[in-house]
Curated annotation (Swiss-Prot):
InterPro entries: LipoPS_assembly_LptD, LptD, LptD_2, LptD_C. It comes from the Bacteria. GO terms for biological process: Gram-negative-bacterium-type cell outer membrane assembly; lipopolysaccharide transport. Component of the lipopolysaccharide transport and assembly complex. Interacts with LptE and LptA. Belongs to the LptD family. Keywords: Cell outer membrane, Membrane, Signal. The lineage of its organism: Bacteria, Pseudomonadati, Pseudomonadota, Betaproteobacteria, Rhodocyclales. This is LPS-assembly protein LptD. It is found in: Cell outer membrane. Together with LptE, is involved in the assembly of lipopolysaccharide (LPS) at the surface of the outer membrane. Residues 1-101 are annotated as: Disordered.
Amino acid sequence: MPALVVSPDLVRGAAGASAAPTPAPAAATPGRTVRDVTSPVEVRPVEPSSPAAQVPMAPARPAAATGQASPAAAAPASAAPAASASPADATARKPGSTEVRALRIRGTRSVELVAEGDAELQRDDILLTADALTYREPTDEALAEGNVRLRQGPDVISGPSASLVVGERTGDFQSPRYEITRTKAGLEPGDPPRQVSGGGHADVLHFEGENQYRLENATWSTCSVDDPDWYIKARDLQLDYDREIGVAKGGTVVFKDVPFFWMPWAEFPLVGQRQSGVLPPTIGSSNKTGLDLTVPYYWNIAPNYDATITPRYMGRRGLQLGGEFRYLGDSYAGEVRAEWLGRDRITGEQRTLGSLQHRQQITSSLYGSLDINGVSDDDYFEDLSSRVSVASRVNLLREGRLVYVGSPWWSASALVQSYQTLNSDPDNPVTTPYRRVPQLLTTASRPDLPAGLTFNWHGEYVQFAHPDEDHPEGNRFTAYPQLSLPMQRAGFYVTPKVGVHYTRYDLDEPVAGLTDARTSITRTVPIFSVDSGVTFERDAQFFGTAFTQTLEPRLYYLNVPYRRQNDIPLFDTSRYDFGFAQIFAENRYTGGDRIGDANQLTAAVTTRLIDPETGSERMRALVGQRYYFEDQRVTAGEALRTSRRTDVLGGFSGRITRYSTVDTLLQYNPEDNETERFNFTFRYQPEFAKALNLGYRYARSLVSPDGTIGLRDVNVSGQWPLGGGWYGVGRLTHSLKDDRLTEAIAGIEYDGGCWVARVAMHRFATDPNDVTKAVFIQLELNDLASIGSSPVNLIKRSVPGYGKINDPAANRVFGIE
């Protein structure tokens, strides 16, 4: 039995009056007696061998200024047996000891102690307070009456009466008000942990061991305990904080005093972790599906396996059954997803979806993956999804990959890849990419060779196949060794580089339309380049603020001789989009079917403003242009370049005020005196959940998926508090070229403190004649559940700077991540 320290707290009033303790019952062995209040007194422990003792009186305390009694807790004495406690060590407390404090204490230590008046019992981090408290040491039982309050760490339970076996954590609490707090992992990797509190009221709370509670006719919520906006009301409520699971029997979810979700039996997460059970429904609507109702069932099979079974009713389409299975092992992870609609009410056809993603660490050096996706028809996503990012998918990947890392400087991989191409618009068919059956790759990079050289290698063998018979097929072998000599000093660098790009093709048949086309083709192209740059710095001051300004000119020379390539099919090659990412590239084409001839010099200059105290970049401006010394001869189907210089590229980005940022990009054609491309974005974001954005896009020669040429649109978006917990959010994108609205989002959010409600409407046009509309309605109960269809991901993609206004649960609904 833990050692017991008895510390009576006596109160001295005005004029020297004293409150004497109630004497303890007589005992066979005389105990210590209470000394006169005028003499010095030491607080002493009662040794475990003493059957009874009279309580010593505490030293007199100063009276309150008003002459009234001023209670204060005396410091407990040491628990060391057979030794007196001095005032110097009175604050020491032995771990596991039990301390009883009160204004009056009477009784026999080894039988029963009765503490009255501001009574306290403390053992380690447990503190039980009440008007009156009885402690029975033989059974370690505490009985408390009147204003009872139990605190253990951050947990607090209060009520009129309680009984508790302290060591076993068993007992009962009558009519309790309780609040239990636990630490939950951060919302994102690297985020600090946060506190999650749940509490409520009950007729009776039963302690059933450490971290185990059972409550009768109880409520539970993450809102304020005394006035919750939402709560779970249950006939029987079990809270298991070891497994972090709550079980409600005969339960109902109540929101604003209105019952809206009945749970005859349900498990729910106490701190947001995954739990098996029927999940709250997802309700939405779109013009493609009509009423859209989903009632998922989540099955937490094991800590590393789970599944979700998702019946979905669509008013215009019918009943769909979906499922997802996720798994995780020491060396593997993945998920399987399937959807089945037996008969679409509109098309009259069966519609299905299947998806598999698997990742496998086979050995310490060998890694494998599978990514297989497929649907039953071309219109599957457009008809059955309300998300623009999904509805606009056209190529579904199907691939298997093996990667071998031989050492820190070389690796190899094998790939088998194909696509399912969705052609939902017969008037604008999408070209199906070539299959790679297989592709073998080797790469290497070895710096710090003798004389400071760096060696790089790229090798490839790939067999191309196509589902359409009118496309040529064949294989390609590539070997590209390179040597460079990086020379870097303070303030400048120069890197000359030389390589030989060798390619061999073996085609099933020659390219149609060429009289001298070959089926066996070799191409050897030497490539030489020099990259160089200088950095200048100076102290500068703009608008009264000190900066470090840099000036960074860069020159890049590239020489690639012409080689005939017009009889090589375009298996995986197209022209890069011109921009700053490509202006210093070695090849103007993607893939390996074209090596662009070049005798050119790229010149660019960048200037930055850097905060000298923090080193952060405040602003950046850059301009660049490429100059050609020879005419272009190699093409990939595009028109030949005739000018001796490219368009001028210019860009500016930075924080122009404390809360405002600007990002611009300009592509200017000096030959035609035309702007080819211009992008402008402005953001004002003074604080969290306050953001306003303005954007403009212009592209003179961009070819749209529908075949139209040119782009010119403006968009505005933002999120802003409206007052009283209300927030507005929205986005408008208007095509100035076609004078039509291409996308619109309008939403409103309300932050209720422990819950958030969202309503949003979305309209987008996948093409001028096909407009999809969707409505999202969501009620999110913090750290418990999200009910309805969530617009959050849509808004995050569409409104830069959007902030989710509540501290969201890590999981969507009742534990699904």
